[in-house]
Amino acid sequence: MKPSDVRSKAFAMPLTSPAFPMGPYRFVDREFVIITYRTDPERLRAVVPEPLQIAEPLVHYEFIRMADSTGFGDYTESGQVIPVEYNGQAGGYTLAMYLDDHPPIAGGRELWGFPKKLASPTLHVNTDHILGTLDYGKVRVATGTMGYKHKELDLDEQMKRLAGPNFLLKIIPHVDGSARVCELVRYYLQDIKMKGAWTGPASLELAPHALAPVADLPVLEIVEARHIVADLTLGLGEVVYDYLAQ
């Protein structure tokens, strides 16, 4: 294979059978349970990278069911998103996500810089409530419950919330172990079609784990819970801050 062939085909590894396809990445009937809670502000400051700023000491704990996604297939994801501001623009910073499917792990890390790790999350209706769980190995590190469709939410308002900016810290090492890429990336969810949004009573329990430290941001108070179903496209990102150029 000639160098020009390598350049023309280079998108993802392995070269001859990439771990994930080119986009666009469309999700149909993507289901979210988002439990917002108040936590320790000092612990938040210790994990949120500047120039992002914390507005309130809140965390969105998310369970996401994605049964129909372009190129990525059928999978479930769980993790923590922190409300932040960047140059006065409100958005969400993804601290860590845990999922059970290799293509979105590889694609998420390599394309956008999603901090994804392999684990075993679930999300399903359990009689009269929605149950979300996250197991890392044999340890249950997160359990979330929410009353099933107790009260409808305004779809336009929820769509605006989903359409806001999201931020990631993309890190790719050089072959010598030093940082080759260290960037703050911004991306958006696009072409959103809302199919339903509800709220209700919720609970969230987090347990300590050395390699899935969701409990490092402790639950002090449940502030809000949302159950959302939507079709959407995961837009590609843009670099807003290069740490290596500073």
Curated annotation (Swiss-Prot):
| NCBIfam families according to UniProt | PRK02265.1 (NF002614)
Which keywords accompany this UniProt record?
Decarboxylase, Lyase, Schiff base
GO molecular function: any one?
Answer: acetoacetate decarboxylase activity
Q: What is this protein called?
A: Acetoacetate decarboxylase
Task: Give the Enzyme Commission number.
Answer: 4.1.1.4
Q: Coiled-coil ranges per the record?
A: none
Protein's UniProt keywords contain Lyase: yes
**Role description:** Catalyzes the conversion of acetoacetate to acetone and carbon dioxide.
Taxonomic superkingdom? Bacteria
Q: Where is the active site?
A: 116 (schiff-base intermediate with acetoacetate)
Name the InterPro entries for this protein: Acetoacetate_decarboxylase, Acetoacetate_decarboxylase_bac, ADC_dom_sf
Reaction equation(s) it catalyzes: acetoacetate + H(+) = acetone + CO2
The family line of this record is: Belongs to the ADC family.
| Species in which this protein is naturally found | Burkholderia vietnamiensis (strain G4 / LMG 22486) (Burkholderia cepacia (strain R1808))
- Entry-linked HAMAP family: ADC
